[in-house]
Amino acid sequence: MSPEAIPDPESMLAEQAHDALDPDLRRSWQELADEVREHQFRYYIRDAPIITDAEFDQLLRRLQALEDEYPELRTPDSPTQLVGGAGFATDFTAAEHLERMLSLDNVFDLEELAAWAARIRTEIGADAQYLCELKIDGVALALVYRDGRLERAATRGDGRTGEDVTLNARTIEDIPERLSGTNEFPLPTVVEVRGEVFFRVADFEDLNAGLVAEGKPPFANPRNSAAGSLRQKNPAVTARRRLRMICHGLGHVESSGGSPFPTLHDAYRALKAWGLPVSDHTAQVTGLDAVTERIAYWGEHRHDVEHEIDGVVVKVDAVALQRRLGATSRAPRWAVAYKYPPEEAQTRLLDIRVNVGRTGRVTPFAYMEPVKVAGSTVGLATLHNASEVKRKGVLIGDTVVIRKAGDVIPEVLGPVVDLRDGSEREFVFPTHCPECGSELAPAKEGDADIRCPNTRSCPAQLRERVFHVAGRGAFDIEGLGYEAATALLQAGVIADEGDLFGLTADDLLRTELFTTKAGELSANGKRLLANLGKAKAQPLWRVLVALSIRHVGPTAARALATEFGSLEAIETASEEQLAGTEGVGPTIAAAVIDWFTVDWHRAIVDKWREAGVRMADERDASIERTLEGLSIVVTGSLAGFSRDEAKEAIIARGGKAAGSVSKKTAYVVAGDAPGSKYDKAIELGVPVLDEDGFRRLLAEGPERDAEDGEPG
């Protein structure tokens, strides 16, 4: 594998080690949040993670700990508040789940498990009855059956909206086209079934053998291959892949008899009776001791099952208790995943090479003799930065210990010094960028990371920046994926992201990717041009995000767009004016000022403006300013509003869509599973509205709300 083929490891752990008293605390939070989002994208969208599950879990925990210590940093679009794949554009049609499809919180040792069980016991006043299930390392899928017939299949996505993969799901042998009810378990009118799509180990090995025989690269592990196979554009490819599925839960159920199942165990019996696949390894137990016994057993027998597992999922069995315990914004409180310790192996370190990420960070990678770990073959691992290479003490030629958490790129723990024979050599970090030849240096004194300063034209940074423009948090352009961004740049069709909105059919015909064998523009090419045209009308905050201004994510972008109304006003504003905007502050203000001082940055704006991209928000005069000056926090899920729609409704009426609750908050709008913001509102005495109250507030303002006596 060449350095160019390495997936960009843009954001790594070392950059985030800031002291809690650092005056740039918000910048530290933003960089850590961006790092987590980057790895979520690589895992959920590209099916090509570059760090281990354990490393990602550590990143997410660091972010959670920072937000717990400084709650004012926590925003609705923080990775700690969202389900895995939230905020990323894909090429599939969106499918809204009938009920939120949440993720799971993880625990990594028996002490953490005991703490979770203690919270359950405190809440319900007794030892709970649990279900212990194998945690399959696959891809979550939701099936909707209406009147017994398969209507739709969708991936988890952001928990509210996933990707419609119905055609592909129909090719999976385990998924029935029609369910059959029984006397004991009659079919509901509508039932949403959740489960995991996976490869059996033997089928995965056969798949890779076939790919190699065809001269194609094999998949790294069963999880990635399952994700890639389920998300194929051609269902015939999925059909050949021998995917399997096991069902492990229910979402929305419409039944004439009300809630049909008192326990999850009963629900699983019903799923099996209807003809759906369920696990033979699920156990119904009572109390923590019985749970730990199941965890210990499967820790010793994890390779005895036909598919890969990376832990045991523990769920409160009684459905009534599940409702009582509720959920956070991203995971149920009544379930937890116990993840087994990563597995380790020894192999030889053949070489260390570097790769350049989107922000210019240069990351060393370990190339190793392929070795079997956790059921798959490993030959590549990240070493993070030059300081980390020295800290680990590894030399090229060493026998090293690698640890694999889940089934992604592993971690090099260190060398086996006793096996050295004197032929080993030290890694010398390059002085120049391997992609563009620029001299490398830290961005500032004391940084652990070395960066390429050629932000304008370094090919690696260009690829990532162009792709960023299409992200769901930016212009949300379907069809402009990583492959398309690379093809456009390599063909010289665009010089940078500034050229995107000026693309024509003739331009796309210069790339093989968008040209048919007959030399005509492909359907994907036509779709890309249409989507670029639609994207020109996106609101100002999305334009700001797309510009890749450091620290400016959706929250800050909305604040700036609301305050200034146009890109020209933002560009000409003083640093003091920018910093005085609620939700912005001095760090972001300085970054905005710095960005607009660069000539080629302003040239991007000029190109977009000339191409017809909307650079100002025009307020709808028909919408009354009923919320002028009010700070409103929305928490939990609302039936009639997406997260963005609720924010935009507040902003359009002159209000501020805040991310955290304080004494300055005028109202908290609490939807389903509101989480800690609701608790904070009660503690501070901030009025709390349900969705109906929110609608009245939008329409009539706070005076009518006070007259109506909305709950507070």
Swiss-Prot record:
Name the UniProt record assigns to this protein: DNA ligase
Keyword Transcription regulation: no
Name of the encoding gene: ligA
GO biological-process terms attached to the record: DNA repair; DNA replication
NCBIfam families, per the entry: dnlj (TIGR00575), PRK07956.1 (NF005932)
BRCT domain segment(s): 622-711
GO MF entries: DNA ligase (NAD+) activity; metal ion binding
Reported cofactor(s): Mg(2+); Mn(2+)
UniProt family annotation: Belongs to the NAD-dependent DNA ligase family. LigA subfamily.
A single cellular component GO annotation: cytosol
Sorted UniProt keywords: DNA damage, DNA repair, DNA replication, Ligase, Magnesium, Manganese, Metal-binding, NAD, Zinc
Residues that hold Zn(2+) according to the record: 433, 436, 452, 458
Protein function: DNA ligase that catalyzes the formation of phosphodiester linkages between 5'-phosphoryl and 3'-hydroxyl groups in double-stranded DNA using NAD as a coenzyme and as the energy source for the reaction. It is essential for DNA replication and repair of damaged DNA.
UniProt cross-references to InterPro entries, sorted A to Z: BRCT_dom, BRCT_dom_sf, DisA/LigA_HHH, DNA_ligase, DNA_ligase_AS, DNA_ligase_CS, DNAligase_adenylation, DNAligase_N
Annotated EC: 6.5.1.2
